[in-house]
Swiss-Prot record:
Top-level taxon of the source organism: Bacteria
Function: Involved in unsaturated fatty acids biosynthesis. Catalyzes the dehydration of short chain beta-hydroxyacyl-ACPs and long chain saturated and unsaturated beta-hydroxyacyl-ACPs.
HAMAP family, per the entry: FabZ
Protein name per UniProt: 3-hydroxyacyl-[acyl-carrier-protein] dehydratase FabZ
Gene Ontology cellular component terms for the protein in this record: cytoplasm; membrane
Keywords on record: Cytoplasm, Lipid A biosynthesis, Lipid biosynthesis, Lipid metabolism, Lyase
Protein species of origin: Campylobacter hominis (strain ATCC BAA-381 / DSM 21671 / CCUG 45161 / LMG 19568 / NCTC 13146 / CH001A)
Primary site of residence: cytoplasm
Catalytic activity, EC: 4.2.1.59
UniProt record similarity statement: Belongs to the thioester dehydratase family. FabZ subfamily.
Location within or outside the cell: Cytoplasm
Positions annotated as active site in the UniProt record: H48
Keyword Lyase recorded: yes
């Protein structure tokens, strides 16, 4: 398990754009499970949408990418990562299946499809109550800062 303090050591993101709260399972080079507790107090709900708050799809995909970044970092053991960052490269096959609302616990599950050098190809799902809310394939690359 990886708590928020360790996530902050890995990812450069900070409030209001840090979109994972905890990693609950990590199999380096294989998969990750992480979650975000979606609360009504998030700034995004002031405008998306007043009276009918829905967590934006782009934020779901970004949270998925952040979980993938943690997976890539924790899977890379053969080099010093202190001056490295993971950049999100592509989104493919993104689908949104159900809305995410305040009070939902959004769980990210990502599996490595391919890894070559510094490039990672991942298949991700975002779930609420074990039901798929969104899915996508992502590519990321570990780069120098």
């Amino acid at each position: 398990m990886i708590d928020i303090n360790e996530i902050l050591e890995i990812l450069p993101h900070r409030f209001p754009f840090l979109l994972i709260d905890r990693v609950i399972d990590l199999q380096p080079g294989i998969s990750i499970k992480a979650y975000k507790n979606v609360t009504f107090n998030e700034q995004i709900f002031q405008g998306h949408f007043p009276g009918h708050p829905i967590y934006p799809g782009v934020m779901i995909i970004e949270g998925m990418a952040q979980a993938g970044g943690v997976l890539a970092f924790k899977s890379t053991t053969d080099e010093d990562l202190s001056n490295k960052v993971v950049y999100f490269m592509t989104i493919d096959k993104a689908k949104f299946r159900q809305p995410i609302r305040p009070g939902d616990r959004l769980e990210y599950r990502l599996n490595v499809l391919k890894h070559r050098g510094r490039i990672w190809v991942l298949k991700g799902e975002a779930l609420v109550d074990d039901k798929v809310a969104a899915e996508a394939e992502l590519q990321a690359m570990i780069m120098d800062k």
